[in-house]
């Protein structure tokens, strides 16, 4: 057999307790349908992901105008297709119900599209391929939403990755991919079985790491970020949904 694709040469940690998801970990390439149907979350580190290559595209993100403050920068696009040949779907508002998002639910949020140059990068294609592999969707027919988000932490403004609080996104799968953490504290990713229960997962995702979440069974949240020095800090992530 030939060498496996680079994005599958990784250690995948199956869902477990808070701060220790899966203990020593289990090597996993392609989950079966039955295993996927039963999963809550999976944590993975992508090997040799060139996160620096996407930095210029995060530096060029516009301010999210739908929340108070200027700490969140954001783009959003919808796609079908393979990672190397994504088909951009018609531009649409991003709308969530008020039951899902109590902060911005019911608002037609019109975010700028992801830049064409980003789609051509191997690192970005690896992120998309990993999401497809572990969600087991058919990318030719299933719509993928891709949010590109930068949170800025400054001395004058706290960075809130999830100002809506503990929530679900209203999809089957959510993939949170950490691309960059620079000069910040906080930004822990939490997963919950219910909003009024302690988290079952609590971890700071490091660059190259991502967590796949069953959005039907779990809620998620990310804590506020603060700068660790005099200069602004940033947290860059891709959030993929299907």
Task: Please annotate each region the language model reported.
Residues 138-206:
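Catalytic core of non-heme Fe(II) oxygenases with the double-stranded beta-helix
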Residues 75, 142, 171, 185, ...:
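Residues that flank catalytic or metal-binding motifs in active/ligand-binding sites
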Residues 78, 165, 174-176, 210-212, ...:
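Conserved hydrophobic/aromatic beta-strand scaffold that supports enzyme active sites
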Residues 76-82, 147-149, 178, 214, ...:
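Structured loops at beta-to-helix junctions and adjacent beta-edge loops in soluble globular domains
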Residues 188-242:
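Catalytic core of Fe(II)/2-oxoglutarate
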